Amino acid sequence: MKKYFVADFNVIDVPTGGGEWVDDFIIKKFNLEFLHTRNINSFDQTAFYVFSNISLLPQHLLNQIHSLNYVILEHDYKICLSRHPWRYQDNIIPQQERINYSLYKNAKAVFVQTTDHMNVYLKNDVEANFVNLECSIWSDEDLNMLENINNENTNKNGKYAVYFTNNWIKNTQGNLKYCAENKLQNYILKENRNRVEFLSNLAKCEGIVFFPLARETFCRLVVEAKCLGLNVITSKNYGALKFF
């Protein structure tokens, strides 16, 4: 049986994406063939599929998924067009705006990252075989890298990292404003295709300021910052409340 992993992007396309690193681990661990959504014209009814972020998949293809043999590795929410249930009161999507419910109901399993992540689905009456991972996923190689970088950066620079990105959800300008108002010297943490360099630059800092505008399902950056010995200034929106 052929085994495919389907997503809009992979870690080569988006080397700074936390979700893409999770996907990359799963692809390698289970020896899956990666398929970009943009390259899919039809599905193999005899194959097994893992679907990740598939917002770029045309609706007529989405409608065919329910008949396949598949699981979903979820990083956000596919039950409304914006993928942001937090925009609605109590995260409850109006009935007329709910989409893709059969996608979840017919999956062999739907892997979610936290209890909070799962509860948003349950509040919106989504039927599925949910499997709560209660965490993100790191490879042994990644964990060893974090440990080595932490050991090499015991002397902090006294600055607070602000992740500099065009992704509005990460709230770069708001984080810079917080630093200014609270007299914290900021360190601009630029996106970097080299993961070791990115985390090494983060590890030099005293802390990180991160107030995402959207409710994240699990912010790996915040957890990795904590692993690297940084003070973390954030809000409940970072999604990994069980950890600290």
Task: List the predicted regions and their residue ranges.
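N-terminal pre-catalytic "stem/leader" segment of glycosyltransferase-like enzymes
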Residues: 1-60, 66, 219, 233-240, ...
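Active-site proximal beta-strand in glycosyltransferases
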Residues: 48-50, 65-94
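Alpha-helix capping/helix-boundary segments
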Residues: 55-56, 78, 116-118, 239
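Membrane-proximal helix-turn-helix segments that form the acceptor-binding/catalytic region
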Residues: 89-110, 203
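Conserved catalytic-core segment of nucleotide-activated headgroup transferases in glycan assembly
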Residues: 138-198
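Acidic donor-binding loop of glycosyltransferase active sites
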Residues: 203-217, 230-231
